[in-house]
Amino acid sequence: MHCPFCFAVDTKVIDSRLVGEGSSVRRRRQCLVCNERFTTFEVAELVMPRVVKSNDVREPFNEEKLRSGMLRALEKRPVSSDDVEMAISHIKSQLRATGEREVPSKMIGNLVMEQLKKLDKVAYIRFASVYRSFEDIKEFGEEIARLED
C-alpha cells in the first residue's frame, strides 16, 4: 500500500485487529521511507445480485431502498436501529447465498416480510398490506389470523 504522506510504495503492517464483528480488519501501518503511521480498513467486496422487477426491468441491488422500506414499516415501533441493521445484513447474506447473479424482487419482499415478522408483528402487517396490495379489512384480518397460528 502506498504511503498517504510521501507516496512511497513500501509500508509495513504494525498491528491488525478484527472490527465490526469480524467483518473487517483494521491495520496500523508504518511507511518504511518517512516512518509516518496510518490506519487502513479492509473489508471483503461482496457483490450483490441484480434485482429483476416484476416488469422484467433489471436494476442494481439498492440497500437504501431496502432500508427505507423497512423503516417505513417500522415507523414509531419499538425496534432498535441495531436490530434493523442486523435484519438488513441477514437479508443481504441470504441474497448472496443464493449464488445467483439476479434475484426476483419478489424474493427480496418475502425476505423482508420474514425479518419483519421476527422484529415486530405490526410492522410486518404494515409491510404486507402494501406489498401484497390488501384491498379490504378482511385481508388484514386473514393475515393477522395467520400470525396468531
From Swiss-Prot:
Function: Negatively regulates transcription of bacterial ribonucleotide reductase nrd genes and operons by binding to NrdR-boxes.
GO MF entries: ATP binding; DNA binding; zinc ion binding
Positions of unnamed zinc fingers: 3-34
One protein family per Pfam: Zn_ribbon_NrdR
Cofactor-binding details, from the entry: Binds 1 zinc ion.
Name of the featured protein: Transcriptional repressor NrdR
Needed cofactors: Zn(2+)
Keyword vocabulary terms for this entry: ATP-binding, DNA-binding, Metal-binding, Nucleotide-binding, Repressor, Transcription, Transcription regulation, Zinc, Zinc-finger
Organism: Escherichia fergusonii (strain ATCC 35469 / DSM 13698 / CCUG 18766 / IAM 14443 / JCM 21226 / LMG 7866 / NBRC 102419 / NCTC 12128 / CDC 0568-73)
Coiled coil regions in record: none
Family label: Belongs to the NrdR family.
GO biological process: negative regulation of DNA-templated transcription
Occurrences of domain ATP-cone (ranges): 49-139
